[in-house]
Structure formats: structure tokens, C-alpha cells
């Protein structure tokens, strides 16, 4: 069959060697007419098709990507297509947030004897891609910089945590300290508005411990490096989810970790505070007054209500108290989770945009990216830093090309590696020195995972299995497409 109309488009197909490739061969032997746009890549199993293959193809200029494997229950490697089904469905729901039309990607199942079905699949998919036309390229998009509306109503009252019993926490840590090699918490950084990690090994170290609205760094990030040692960690509710997720994946041992939980009433977004303060030489003092924080800079007081200056993650937080803790200090904030999950500010902004606007949005922000990898280094779940794809040369995933495409590809790699694992702690975005809203990519995947897998949220249950590490023979919310 000739090209459907006009210019031949670039469509990439990843076909399972045992079934779908055989089905394509059966169609060819039967001389069934097929469009010629598809370029086939033969793979051992659909379970070996990393979602990054699909993203790399789409970002590099493919107009469409098709993945086809054996029917569920017929996999030659027992369960490869069961795992593929979950990964690829999450990917399909992730693509639109990048500005890529989800219809440019499809996956299906075709056996070696189904030559006629293969003809239907490739013809229908090629027709769909021709209707969409050539895929827009991020390099050609007009840069668009837009900020999220941070005035969205929070799910719960936000206060500065001024009543947090710090002395009680210090006493609890000192009591446990002889049994532990170290306890991780926060101390004042170079001024009162900046917290730094604190590694407490002596009672004198414990006296340096601070608690307040600027305790934003996630101490769970350091736990994997202490595996095999007895260690304590002081956590807010969001931090505790990271600890639970590390336990789920056996990246830390439960018997080795003592969790000190403190109730949290929200933390301030230091980037927005800095912007409001303008030029200043030094921050002299930070004080909490009810539901606001008063920052004294260069002798002048500035009042910051948490309802206006809280971090975006605090506005949709459903865990004001630690999910799991050995020692709980203070009374948790009374809170009833809402019946419907609120949309985070950055994700709400992207939801309001068209696909071309989203592509322009990422073009504008990726031009600002320094490729410093602070987002990776701050992430508590990014634990393969000894062999990260950013530096890997075998396989060679990324080049050192300073292009928006390579920068966005790194961010999508990070986001997809966190699929079903990201707890939404926001450290990636907080650590970004130029303030790129990269948390929205992780939030979109978390939303897709929650939709597909009965509201699953990472880091809430230590005995749960992350969805992409398992499968169901019959998936409740994933269904085969009709190609007729």
C-alpha cells in the first residue's frame, strides 16, 4: 500500500520478536496491503520496551510510536507484557503534560497468527498519525514563561508551627541517642530563614536542632547512605512518606531506623519570600505569629501569611503528621482528608493550557535549565547516583548537548524513574537554582498512577507494593483498544 497521503511520516514500531513481529511477517507473506510509514524495531519482549525508548523517539522527531507484543497470558517470558501494560499506560497519560498528543503513541497485542489484525492496527494507527500531521518539535515552539497561581485555597489551615514542642523533641532524641550512630534533623543555616541538615551524634549537637517554617529540606534523602547503621531521622508528614517509600523498596532497614515525627502546619517558599523581600543584606530574625511568619531583614519587619507564601506542596498536603513514627512529639493538626484530591498549583496551570502552550512552556523553562542535576541530588528516591543515566555511556542515553530537547529528556527520565515512587516532597523543585516547576512532571505521573491503580499514593503504606513493580492479570482500569 502506498503512503496514505502526501509526505511519508516517521512512525516507529517496537515489535515483540515472538508474536507481533511474526504477525507482521504473516501479513507480509499474505501480501496484505499496509502503509509504508512504519519503521520496525524488533525487540525480545514488549516488557523490554522502556518507556524512555518511546519518549526518545518522540522527542527526536518521530511523528508516532507503536508498541506491540504478545497477548496477556501468552508472553514467552511469563509476565513481560503484564509489566509493559502498566508502564505504557502510565506513559500514555504522562505525554500530554509535555505538550505531546497522547494519540501519537499506542500499544497493542498481536499474535504471530493474526496477520489480518496487524494490518488493521498499522493501517488505523498510520491514518491517525496522518490526521494529526507532523509532530511539533520543542525546538520550534515559542518560549512561554508563566507562573502558577499560588493563591489556591489550601486543603487545611496553614500555620507556622509555632507551638511545636521543640524542647520535648530534643529530650526524646537525647534519650534515644546512645542507641544510634546519628540522628538527622535541621539546624540554622547562614541565617534564620535558611535551614541546613544537622547530623546529631552528641547531646551538644542536639541543642543545635531547630524547628519552624523554613525546615524545608527532606532529611530522608540521606538515609540510604546510612544503610546498615543505626540512625534516627526527624520528619514532617511529607518527609515521612519518603521514609516509608524507602522502606517499601528495601533501600533502608526498618530495624535500623528510628523515626521522630513532628506535626507540621506548612513551610514557607523561600524563593517567593526572597522575591518579596527584594534586595537585603541580612535576615536578622524570624518569628511566628499565629498563621504568619515575621521576617526581620536589615532591621525592617515583613509579614508573610502562610496561606499566601506556603510552598505549593503544602497547599495539597494530606499528611500534616508523620505517616509512620516510632516517637511522636506534639499533637498533630486536626485534619480530615477531602473526598477529592486537589490539583497542585503548577499542575493546575498546565491543565489550563493547550498542547502547543505546554510545549512552549517547557521550551521556555528548559532554556533556563543549567543541567546542574541539583534536582536529582536532592531527591530522596533517586538512589542510583553511582550509575545515573546522566553520566552513563553504555547505554548512552544522554548527550552533553546544551539543547532544550536533551534537558527535557533528562527531566522525563527522572520523572518516569519515579513513577509510582514519588512522594511529592518537592525537593527537586526547591533545589532548582533557577526555579523551574519540574515537580509538575512528577505530579502528573502520580495523578496517572492514582487514577489507574485505585488511588494509590506513594509512601503511605510500608507493606504495599509500588504499582509498577507488580501487575494484575486482569487490570481494572486498563483496557485493550479496539482497532476495527
Where are these regions (language model features)?
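Iron-sulfur-associated redox domains of electron-transfer enzymes in respiratory
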Residues: 1-362
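Short cysteine clusters
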Residues: 16-19, 65, 70, 75, ...
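Internal, well-ordered alpha-helical scaffold/interface segments
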Residues: 55, 360-363, 367-373, 377
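Ferredoxin-type iron-sulfur electron-transfer modules in oxidoreductases and energy-metabolism complexes
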Residues: 95-97, 338-367, 381-484
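Glycine-centered loop/turn positions within well-structured domains
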Residues: 241, 377, 439
Amino acid at each position: 500500500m502506498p503512503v496514505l497521503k502526501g509526505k511519508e511520516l516517521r512512525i516507529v514500531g517496537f515489535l515483540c520478536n515472538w508474536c507481533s513481529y511474526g504477525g507482521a511477517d504473516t501479513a507480509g507473506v499474505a501480501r496484505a496491503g499496509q502503509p509504508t510509514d512504519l519503521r520496525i524495531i524488533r525487540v525480545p519482549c514488549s516488557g523490554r520496551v522502556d518507556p524512555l525508548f518511546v519518549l526518545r523517539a518522540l522527542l527526536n522527531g518521530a511523528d508516532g510510536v507503536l508498541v506491540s507484543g504478545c497477548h496477556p497470558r501468552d508472553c514467552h517470558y511469563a509476565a513481560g507484557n503484564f509489566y509493559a501494560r502498566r508502564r505504557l499506560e502510565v506513559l500514555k497519560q504522562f505525554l500530554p503534560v509535555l505538550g505531546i498528543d497522547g494519540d501519537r503513541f499506542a500499544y497493542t497485542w498481536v499474535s504471530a497468527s493474526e496477520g489480518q489484525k496487524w494490518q488493521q492496527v498499522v493501517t488505523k494507527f498510520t491514518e491517525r498519525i496522518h490526521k494529526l500531521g507532523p509532530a511539533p518539535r520543542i525546538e520550534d515552539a515559542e518560549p512561554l514563561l508563566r507562573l502558577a497561581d499560588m493563591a489556591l485555597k489550601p486543603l487545611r489551615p496553614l500555620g507556622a508551627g509555632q507551638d511545636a514542642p521543640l524542647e520535648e523533641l530534643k529530650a526524646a532524641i537525647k534519650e534515644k541517642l546512645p542507641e544510634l550512630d546519628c540522628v538527622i534533623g535541621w539546624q540554622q543555616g547562614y541565617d534564620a530563614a535558611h535551614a541546613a541538615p544537622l547530623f546529631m551524634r552528641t547531646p551538644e549537637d542536639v541543642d543545635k536542632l531547630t524547628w519552624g517554617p523554613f525546615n524545608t529540606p527532606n532529611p530522608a534523602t540521606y538515609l540510604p547512605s546510612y544503610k546498615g547503621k543505626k540512625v534516627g531521622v526527624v520528619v514532617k508528614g511529607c518527609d515521612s512518606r519518603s521514609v516509608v517509600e524507602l522502606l517499601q523498596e528495601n533501600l533502608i532497614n526498618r530495624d535500623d531506623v528510628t523515626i521522630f515525627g513532628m506535626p507540621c502546619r506548612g513551610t514557607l517558599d523561600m524563593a517567593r519570600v526572597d522575591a518579596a523581600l527584594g534586595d537585603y543584606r541580612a535576615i536578622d530574625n524570624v518569628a511566628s505569629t499565629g498563621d504568619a511568619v515575621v521576617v526581620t531583614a536589615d532591621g525592617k519587619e515583613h509579614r508573610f501569611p502562610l496561606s499566601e507564601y506556603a510552598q505549593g506542596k503544602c497547599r495539597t498536603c494530606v499528611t500534616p503528621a508523620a505517616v509512620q513514627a516510632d516517637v511522636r512529639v506534639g499533637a498533630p493538626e486536626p485534619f480530615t482528608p477531602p473526598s477529592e484530591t486537589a490539583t497542585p498549583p503548577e499542575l493546575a496551570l498546565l491543565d489550563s493550557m493547550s498542547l502547543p502552550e505546554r510545549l512552549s512552556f517547557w521550551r521556555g523553562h528548559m532554556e533556563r535549565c543549567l543541567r546542574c542535576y541539583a534536582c536529582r541530588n536532592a531527591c530522596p528516591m533517586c538512589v542510583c547516583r553511582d550509575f545515573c543515566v546522566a553520566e552513563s555511556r553504555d547505554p548512552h542515553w544522554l548527550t552533553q548537548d546544551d539543547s532544550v530537547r536533551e534537558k527535557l529528556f533528562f527531566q522525563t527520565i527522572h520523572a518516569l524513574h519515579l513513577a509510582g515512587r514519588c512522594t511529592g516532597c518537592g525537593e527537586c523543585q526547591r533545589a532548582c537554582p533557577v526555579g523551574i516547576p519540574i515537580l509538575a512532571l512528577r505530579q502528573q505521573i502520580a495523578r496517572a498512577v492514582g487514577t489507574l491503580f485505585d488511588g494509590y499514593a506513594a509512601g503511605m503504606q510500608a507493606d504495599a507494593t509500588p504499582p509498577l513493580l507488580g501487575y494484575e492479570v486482569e487490570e481494572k482500569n486498563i483496557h485493550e483498544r479496539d482497532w476495527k
